[in-house]
């Protein structure tokens, strides 16, 4: 099985919160799709709470679209990572890491402005697979943490695992 791009970088050296270009690819029509690693917490050191990340999933995608979408960028999807240390964002376009970081900060400010649980989009049993698993307070705490620390940039060339190590770690 081919090694996924996200497993070729050293998670022990990742900064968080931080933006990283995880992958870029061209569509057959020539559009560029960019996948960003939006790392909220340091891998293997901290994780986002279940309810907090779920509530952020409902809020973050809309707020990021408000701040990043434009003539040259359109967000396709923002999804939480299974390890609960952040989100992957796929989009059409090639915004800079700084543009993404600025939108992320603005989105976290928006999270803090949400007045109550009833204002969380699609929080009902018809549109959400686990409607009871939400916490606006936990989402706001995550947002506060991001705003207090700020958002850095992780560069693939600085985090790349050496080929020898990738061979050593490979499971056949």
Curated annotation (Swiss-Prot):
Known catalytic reactions: S-(5-deoxy-D-ribos-5-yl)-L-homocysteine = (S)-4,5-dihydroxypentane-2,3-dione + L-homocysteine
GO molecular function: iron ion binding; S-ribosylhomocysteine lyase activity
Protein name, UniProt field: S-ribosylhomocysteine lyase
GO biological process per UniProt: quorum sensing
Cofactor or coenzyme needed: Fe cation
Keywords: Autoinducer synthesis, Iron, Lyase, Metal-binding, Quorum sensing
Record-listed E.C. numbers: 4.4.1.21
Family classification: Belongs to the LuxS family.
Recorded superkingdom: Bacteria
Top EC class of this enzyme: lyase
Gene: luxS
Subunit comment: Homodimer.
Cofactor note as given: Binds 1 Fe cation per subunit.
């Amino acid at each position: 099985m081919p090694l996924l791009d996200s497993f070729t970088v050293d998670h022990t050296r990742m900064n968080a919160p931080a933006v990283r270009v995880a992958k870029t690819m061209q569509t057959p029509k020539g559009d560029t799709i960019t996948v960003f690693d939006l790392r909220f917490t340091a891998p293997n050191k901290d994780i986002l709470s279940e309810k907090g990340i779920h509530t952020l999933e409902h809020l973050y995608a809309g707020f990021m679209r408000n701040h990043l979408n434009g003539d040259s960028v359109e967000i396709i999807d923002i999804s939480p990572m299974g390890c609960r240390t952040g989100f992957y964002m796929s989009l059409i376009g090639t915004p800079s890491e700084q543009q993404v970081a600025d939108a992320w900060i603005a989105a976290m400010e928006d999270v803090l402005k949400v007045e109550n649980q009833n204002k969380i989009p699609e929080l009902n049993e018809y549109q959400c697979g686990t409607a009871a698993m939400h916490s606006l307070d936990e989402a706001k705490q995550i947002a506060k943490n991001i705003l207090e620390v700020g958002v850095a940039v992780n560069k693939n060339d600085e985090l790349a695992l050496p080929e020898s190590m990738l061979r050593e770690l490979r499971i056949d």
